[in-house]
Amino acid sequence: MLSHIVEYECQYTDQLYKKRKIWHDGRLKYFQLNNRFMLYTEKDNVLLASEFKINSKELKAILNPEGFDIEEHRIFSQFLVIISNIIEEYDRDIQVAATHVRAYPSNLSVQKQRPLISDNAPSLNHISTAREVHSNIKVTTPNRKQTEDNATKGGFNISKLTLKVNKPFKKPKRILSTNVVNESNRPSIRSQKIQEVTPQLHETNTSTKVQTAGKVALNNDNIAQGNYATITEEAKVRDGSDRKKDMANLSKSGKRRVGGIRRIVHEPLGI
């Protein structure tokens, strides 16, 4: 398509945020067909940046000749531009390609990407023939490899599909004596609770027995004290003549009296 192109003499810089900037000479091209700006270096004619401007207000401000050599325009994201004057204007044919249209591959490239299928292979419609073909194919291993596997793995022919964690079956060990404490045969939580409850019951039973025995012993002591009191009262009632006779008998026999020893007889009370 034919487009009108205008070339401008300009100065550009990439120091966007500095107060004292260094400016370089360049050329700016403007395409009226698609409102495109292109920035080139003056010496080497190297393309530095290109940008499309859609906003009409921005276009008028950039192309206004009153702002030449005065205003700084940020046409590109990385450069500031000051337009000086117009160099030349001309028309040229330009191939405009839409950016949103994707170039799809041709049929030849699609055919190359597809896998090559042999004529002898069965199709999907003939399922029975496909099964027959796959059933005829067998995977065989050499005899040397089988013997090595049997020797290394304890006589068990383990295929590649089995997991490495799996091992041959081993019988459980038998416990010979019941008295041997084995950590693997520890009681469960329920049996532990029962064992904890039984000693508590035993303690409560023994405490009740001790309390009843103490009460019985106190009753017996009270009875004994009552009998002793009655006997001592009877002894006090004795006459002085009996005591004198006892003393005389002891002096004749030559025995020395150590103390008054009395025999206390406990008799049951009729309660």
UniProtKB/Swiss-Prot annotation:
<protein>
    <recommendedName>
        <fullName>Uncharacterized protein YGR042W</fullName>
    </recommendedName>
</protein>
<dbReference type="InterPro" id="IPR018838">
    <property type="entry name" value="ZGRF1-like_N"/>
</dbReference>
<dbReference type="GO" id="GO:0005634">
    <property type="term" value="C:nucleus"/>
</dbReference>
<dbReference type="Pfam" id="PF10382">
    <property type="entry name" value="ZGRF1-like_N"/>
</dbReference>
<dbReference type="GO" id="GO:0008047">
    <property type="term" value="F:enzyme activator activity"/>
</dbReference>
<dbReference type="GO" id="GO:0032205">
    <property type="term" value="P:negative regulation of telomere maintenance"/>
</dbReference>
<dbReference type="GO" id="GO:0005737">
    <property type="term" value="C:cytoplasm"/>
</dbReference>
<dbReference type="GO" id="GO:0000781">
    <property type="term" value="C:chromosome, telomeric region"/>
</dbReference>
<dbReference type="GO" id="GO:0035861">
    <property type="term" value="C:site of double-strand break"/>
</dbReference>
